[in-house]
């Protein structure tokens, strides 16, 4: 039970950080403006993403909300079943849950997701903190599952 409580607190803290950064961006940067943050590496901007990655499927908020809920519920179920597995499995699932819920909050409360990080050195989608959680979480989860498969678990 203690491990579940710790994971729940971590999820809440991660969501809080995501929402705090988004709130700061909305208050400090006008929509569409780009400001250098780490020169030649990352700029900050304020984008209202009404779609998915690379702004695909614009204005399909209900679809994204349903998909997000299904993924988050699935991740919570899988986490519950695998809570005693490797640290990395738990970490990956924790990040996926936090990232999914962070963007879900935006979609339900505002009708769009606030994105802010623009990589200056590559033509890549503008993304947010929750997207980072999701990406890192999926990578960690895949590596953990691959490692378990190799080890025969």
Descriptions of predicted regions:
Residues 1-153:
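Alpha-helical transmembrane bundles and membrane-interface segments of multipass inner-membrane proteins
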């Amino acid at each position: 039970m203690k491990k579940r409580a710790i994971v729940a607190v971590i999820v809440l803290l991660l969501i809080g950080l995501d929402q705090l950064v988004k709130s700061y961006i909305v208050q400090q940067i006008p929509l569409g403006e780009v400001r250098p943050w780490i020169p030649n590496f990352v700029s900050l901007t304020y984008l209202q993403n009404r779609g998915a990655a690379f702004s695909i499927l614009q204005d399909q908020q209900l679809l994204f909300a349903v998909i997000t809920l299904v993924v988050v519920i699935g991740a919570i179920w899988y986490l519950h079943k695998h809570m005693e597995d490797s640290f990395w499995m738990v970490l990956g699932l924790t990040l996926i849950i936090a990232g999914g819920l962070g963007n879900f909050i935006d979609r339900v409360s505002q009708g769009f997701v606030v994105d802010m990080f623009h990589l200056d050195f590559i033509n890549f989608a503008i993304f947010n903190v929750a997207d980072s959680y999701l990406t890192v979480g999926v990578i960690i989860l895949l590596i953990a599952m691959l490692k378990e498969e190799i080890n025969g678990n």
